[in-house]
Design a protein with these regions (language model features):
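Juxtamembrane intracellular "pre-TM" segments in multi-pass secondary transporters
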Residues: 6-27, 203-232, 410
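C-terminal membrane-cytosol helix-exit motif in multi-pass small-molecule transporters
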Residues: 189-208, 393-398
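Structural signature of the two symmetry-related core transmembrane helices
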Residues: 94-108, 290-304
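Helix-loop boundary and gating motifs at the non-cytosolic
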Residues: 24-73, 227-264
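Cytoplasmic helix-loop-helix junction between adjacent transmembrane helices
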Residues: 122-161
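Helix-loop junctions at membrane interfaces in 12-TM secondary transporters
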Residues: 111-122, 307-318
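Helix-to-loop junctions at the C-terminal end of transmembrane segments
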Residues: 79-91, 275-288, 372
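Residue-level signature of mid-helix packing/kink "hotspots" within the transmembrane helices
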Residues: 45, 73-81, 165-166, 269-277, ...
Length: 410
């Protein structure tokens, strides 16, 4: 059996019942991870503005920039794999902190690189480091929080990440006008703060593997339930990422200005910030597989309805629909992966989950843009079909997921 040190229970809280049901009862180490993630997201400025930096400051063509960003995406896939292995072998805390510090160093080096070959190499290096913390963070949360509270905890982390990212977009746009070097320094600084905070405030939680227990990535790939769940994530990610690539192109195609896209996406952030804390505790009491299926189906419906949108308000309405699905998906998807994973393999399971999203980021945007060029409705039909198929898959996997959830001992 894998041995995992039990985390001490949090002290009694005097929060009002409404707040206690939503944020109470979670260990202090979780809140340190939450705070570090929030600070890190407050400074997430380099990745969203990287295309602007490469074309506007370093003078790369649009085609060359696309190829460089593809290298970044490939690096991210490798990053998730390596981060998952290190989280299980070296430790969650060390991997998260090391990943954050390495990302900070890569960002500063990239910010001052001028020669194109060096620039391209450093973008790939940044891709290799930037997501290494994710599997460790997911495994750390699963170690710290018991199965009954994981849905709520993952939901709160999702909320913090989205709130921080929304603020970062505003700050990043402002700072970029003063000089792009500010973005690299602020992003690097928040990475360092996150890494140091986790190192000082969060204990190492990695369990020790018994000799006869499986312990490699191949063992994860032999887990059919986990692989099936990750395929659901891949389909969802393919569709969800159309919001940042194909959706703005579709809105421009019908004559809408960039401000209309900004308004629609602002509704996404506002919806998450308002709705997630209200329903997080309730979602924790629901069957995870059914919530996942519902979330994926609602996302498919929202993107499918985009085929009929022709005004700013119509596009905003479709965003509101799939935002609800995004909230449902985010609340349970990571919890399902954590429930499926043996404690000593949680990093690798989280790495496989992250690799699915990274692969979706490589496949989704070019496929969506290509289909939009053929027919304005075609990418949205594909989105609806993919999400419908994935939702059916999540329901089919439900009985196996429930059996595993009952069988695994935390």
């Amino acid at each position: 059996m894998t041995s995992v040190e039990e985390m001490p229970l949090p002290p009694p809280t005097r929060l009002p019942p409404f707040l206690h049901a939503r944020v109470g009862g979670l260990p202090r180490a979780f809140w340190a991870l939450w705070a570090g993630s929030f600070v890190n997201r407050l400074g997430t400025m380099v990745e969203p503005f990287l295309a602007f930096y490469l074309t506007g400051v370093r003078g790369l063509s649009v085609t060359a920039t696309g190829m460089v960003l593809a290298l970044f995406g490939l690096g991210s896939i490798v990053s998730q794999f390596v981060g998952g292995v290190l989280a299980d072998r070296v430790g969650r805390r060390a991997t998260l902190t090391g990943g954050m510090l390495a990302t900070a160093a890569a960002m500063l080096a990239l910010g001052y690189a001028t020669a194109t070959p060096v620039l391209v190499a450093l973008v790939f290096v940044l891709g290799l480091t930037i997501d290494a913390y994710r599997p460790a963070s997911q495994a750390l949360l699963a170690d710290l929080v018991g199965p009954a509270e994981r849905t709520r905890a993952f939901g709160l982390l999702f909320w913090a990440i989205n709130l921080g990212f929304a603020v970062a977009m505003v700050l990043g746009g402002t700072l970029s006008r003063a000089g792009f070097s500010w973005l690299f320094w602020v992003d690097a600084a928040t990475c360092v703060v996150c890494g140091v905070l986790v190192w000082r405030a969060v204990p190492e939680t990695r369990g020790r593997r018994a000799e006869r227990e499986p312990g490699g990535f191949a063992d994860v790939l032999r887990d059919r339930v986990a692989v099936g769940s990750v395929l659901v994530v891949l389909c969802y990610g393919f569709v969800y990422l159309q919001a940042y690539s194909t959706l703005p192109l579709a809105m421009r195609r019908v004559g809408l200005p960039p401000s209309a896209y900004g308004f629609a996406m602002a509704l996404n952030g506002i919806g998450i910030v308002i709705v997630q804390p209200l329903i997080g505790a309730w979602l924790g009491r629901r069957d995870h597989s059914r919530v996942l299926a519902a979330g994926v189906a609602v996302v498919g419906a929202g993107f499918g309805l985009t085929a009929f949108a022709a005004s700013a308000w119509a596009f905003a309405a479709t965003v509101a629909v799939w935002t609800l699905g995004e909230i449902l998906f985010a609340a349970v998807s990571s919890a399902i992966v954590a429930d499926l994973a043996p404690p000593h393999l949680r990093g690798r399971y989280g790495g496989l989950y992250g690799m699915a999203f990274a692969l979706a980021s490589l496949l989704g945007p070019p496929a969506g843009g290509g289909l939009l060029g053929l027919a304005s409705w075609s990418p949205w039909l594909l989105c609806a079909i993919l999400c419908g198929t994935a939702a059916a898959g999540a329901l089919a996997l439900g009985p196996a997921v429930r059996r595993r959830r009952r069988a695994l001992k935390h």
